[in-house]
Amino acid sequence: MKKNTPKSFEEALSRLESLTQSMQGEMPLEDALAAYQEGNELVRYCQTKLAQVEQKLQVLDADGTKELNLESDE
């Protein structure tokens, strides 16, 4: 993401929920477009984080002796 990269999956999810609530009310077209774009970026961020965790869990399933590293590779 360009502007405010979330610090965590939970932060991104919380922001997505906030954007969704805002967009359900009255919102000027330009603001709605900006919110949609930000939401799109947040969804991609969350999908990436979930895919990373899923890969790490597959390693555990394949061989329970491997260490689970939840630290970001970024």
Curated annotation (Swiss-Prot):
Under Gene3D superfamilies, the record lists:
Exonuclease VII, small subunit
Q: GO CC terms for this protein?
A: cytosol; exodeoxyribonuclease VII complex
Q: Which GO terms describe its biological process?
A: DNA catabolic process
**One Gene Ontology term of the molecular function aspect:** exodeoxyribonuclease VII activity
**Which Pfam family is one of this chain's hits?**
Exonuc_VII_S
Report which reactions are catalysed by this protein: Exonucleolytic cleavage in either 5'- to 3'- or 3'- to 5'-direction to yield nucleoside 5'-phosphates
List the coiled-coil residues.
none
User: Which UniProt keywords are given for this protein, alphabetically ordered?
Assistant: Cytoplasm, Exonuclease, Hydrolase, Nuclease
Instruction: Look up the EC number in the record and give it.
Output: 3.1.11.6
- InterPro entries assigned to the protein according to its UniProt record, in alphabetical order: Exonuc_VII_S, Exonuc_VII_ssu_sf
* KW Ribosomal protein (keyword) present: no
Q: List the disulfide bonds.
A: none
Entry-linked PANTHER family: EXODEOXYRIBONUCLEASE 7 SMALL SUBUNIT
Q: What is this protein called?
A: Exodeoxyribonuclease 7 small subunit
Q: Which organism is it from?
A: Neisseria gonorrhoeae (strain ATCC 700825 / FA 1090)
Gene name for this UniProt entry:
xseB
